[in-house]
Each structure stands twice: as C-alpha cells, then as structure tokens.
Amino acid sequence: MDQDAFILKEDSEVEREAPGGRESLSDVIGFLDAVLSSEPTDIGGDRSWLHNTINTPQGPGSAHRAKSEGEGEVSTPSTQDNRSGEESRVSGRTSKPEAEAHAGNLDKQNIHRAFGGRTGTNSVSQDLGDGGDSGILENPPNERGYPRSGIEDENREMAAHPDKRGEDQAEGLPEEVRGGTSLPDEGEGGASNNGRSMEPGSSHSARVTGVLVIPSPELEEAVLRRNKRRPTNSGSKPLTPATVPGTRSPPLNRYNSTGSPPGKPPSTQDEHINSGDTPAVRVKDRKPPIGTRSVSDCPANGRPIHPGLESDSTKKGA
C-alpha cells in the first residue's frame, strides 16, 4: 500500500512538472484526428479562416485546443499574416533604385555647380559617354541667390567678345592680368596670346590687381637720370691713406704736410690732371701772392729767404 501511494505521488509530481509536454502531444493528436475525420470535399472550400488571427491566452505560436473535439472544430496553430511584411519588402526594393537615381542626379548638380561657369576651347565635355545631352544646363540659373565672383563674369565677357582685347591694345590701354581659363589664340601657335595659355588654372581664382606696363626708352632715361642724382656713398666719409687697410703712409715732415721729401716741391692736383694732355706747370715758376710765403722758401735752419734776393742771385750767376 505504501509503495502504491508513493508511485502515485511521484506520477502526480511528474505531471505537475511537465504539463506543457502532455498538452502539446494531445493537441497534435487532436489535430491529426480532425484532419483524418474531415471529408475530401471540404478541401477545395473556402480557406479564409486560415488567415484569421486566433487570439489565445497562451501567446502566439502555441497550439489552440478546440473546446470539444466531437463538434468538428479543427485546432490549428496561431499564425500571423505575412502579407504586410512582404509588401513592405517589395516596396523597399522598388524604392531603392529610385533613391539611387535621385542621389546620382544630386551628384551631377553638385559637380556642375563646382565647375560651372568655366568655358574655353580646352574645356572637358560634360556629356556622359553616349555623346547625348546629359540634362545639365551650361549656365544654370542662380537659384540660391549667391553673388557670383567678378572673375567669372569677366571671363564670360571676354569669351563672348574676343575683339575687345584687341581694341584695348590698339588704344594703348594697359591690359589687366586676369586669372581663369585661357582665351583662344589669335595668331599661329599662340604667339599673340600674351602668355595666357601658360597660366595655370587655379580653383580659388586669385585675382591679380597689378598692371603690366612695357617700359619705353623715355621712361628708362628718366629712371637713369634719377638714379644718377642720388649719391652713391651718402653719409660715408672718404677714406684717407692712413685708414686704408694694407697700406702704409710715409712719415710727415713738420714743414711739409703733403708727405713729399724736403727738397722736392709738393705735387698739386693740377699736375695730376694735366699730366696726360698738356705739360705740367711747376709750382716753382708760380709767384706767391703778396703777403704770403711758401713752405719751400723756408730752409732747414729756419731762416726765411726773400724771393727777390733769390731771383737776383740767379740773374747774376747767369
């Protein structure tokens, strides 16, 4: 008796621990019985009940047990309608190419705005492969209202009127250096293009405000005359022989400040100037003015000699 009671007790505990397992098995058995008991003519009937959502307290995915198996109600697992999910996937697939095409159009517009307004003979064609019209305007309207730079306007004006540059040169007006693309050549080999074809195109369009003026002979002469007026060593003192490096000055005599020996008369500036063309005039032949005496008239003993007595002695000796 005790063993039987113990076995029944264990069976009840096992049933409490795993009630879901028995319910699932019973649901499967009931579903099979209902399918087998159904008539073949009901298979082609209305199946709209299969798509109806079954509200069960046990949650989605669990089998629903019929109230009574004898009433002919079929117990089916709860399923959700997946039509909305499939439609959303299809709509997502169709919208993806449209989004890519829209992004491609935006990229084309951005590229045109970045390089818009630049025209010239060597500009790259904007047609995409097939040579047809790409749908991008050559001169798009200013939609955002941003002010355009003056460089682009000048380039457009010069490209539209190439004869204006020749008129400026004929009138003698200085030609302003402009940045941007090069203009078409007016002569053979671009010789008369004034070097525009060699200018590199810059993205920032830095404008040069200076003008190029060709110097004339009169202007060069005026510049040379102005430079001659300026002193070469302004504010610098002339170097004396004593201060010149590498030279030695002879000792000066107390009677002769020019550095010449006592028996030789001092050399003057006139002797150096006239030494090439005319014979030099010696200082000895010159007569000093009245009231003055020369340094050479003083002998070594310090006694002065009157010039008249010296001339008389020479005459008597002659």
From Swiss-Prot:
The modification Phosphoserine is found at residues 68, 125, 192, 249, 257, 260. Residues 1-23, 38-318 are annotated as: Disordered. Keywords: Phosphoprotein. It comes from the Viruses. Residues 7-20, 83-101, 150-168 have a biased composition (Basic and acidic residues). Residues 50-59, 191-206 have a biased composition (Polar residues). The P/V/C gene has two overlapping open reading frames. One encodes the P/V/W proteins and the other the C/Y proteins. This is Protein W. The gene is P/V/C.
